[in-house]
Amino acid sequence: MLAAVALLVWRVLSTGRPTEPQGVERGSAGMASASGSEERAAGEGREPAGAPLTSIAGRFTDQDGHVRALSSLRGVPFVASAIYTRCPSVCPRTVAALHRLDRSLPVGDRPRYVLFSLDPAYDTPRVLRAFAATQALPAPRWMLLRPDTASLPAIARALGLAYSAGEGGGVAHTAVIAIVDSSGSVRERQLGLAQDPAALLAAWRRIGMTQRLPAD
């Protein structure tokens, strides 16, 4: 793990990229690793995100135990992220950023949120449902999905994130919030731990408010 972090830092120093990207960006990533109370962040250049999320096949189970096809999300813009429920610090900060976005919008303009688990072996529907309750993520507007293991690499490519098994059952992963358009394509991404609420709000208004969802 230390060797991987050292390599990332070397890349930052050699390319001049910031260690913690800010704002809504394309094609770069802030790597966040958590083990216990420890966080590390580094920047690593990446290609723009891959295939549309809604074109990814696989088995996705939501917090209520329903099997979902990502193609069913096509037609309505949404905000996507990736978390895992045992994450001690990075993921709660991501969820807090999503709540800030939600509170900044009138009820009728608020997005649908889709959060993919990076720890499907542990994050069963029951665990995801408990997490949703404690984090105030009410269905159906907040959808927490447990992907099958084979689908995770495609999800990571679509969101533009990197992840790997960490220490003590943790997951080293990129902190990312993505704005997804009605075709299922990631249009813009906010990366790293230094979230920019104004930029995220502007991106949603520009891309996501082409369709409205009914209030909860």
Feature annotation, model-predicted:
Residues 93-155:
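Structural microenvironment flanking redox-active thiols in thiol-disulfide oxidoreductases
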Residues 69-98:
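Short active-site neighborhood of thiol/selenol oxidoreductases, capturing the structured segment around
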Residues 57-78, 102-105:
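A short beta-strand-turn-helix
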Residues 1-57, 210, 216:
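N-terminal targeting signals for export/organelle localization
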Residues 141-142, 153, 157-166, 170-178:
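Structural micro-motif
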Residues 103-107, 133-137, 157-161, 185, ...:
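Sec-exported extracytoplasmic/periplasmic mature domains
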Residues 53-55, 77, 172-174:
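Short, small/polar residue-rich loop motifs at catalytic or cofactor-binding pockets
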Residues 166-216:
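Thiol-/selenol-based redox modules, centered on thioredoxin-like
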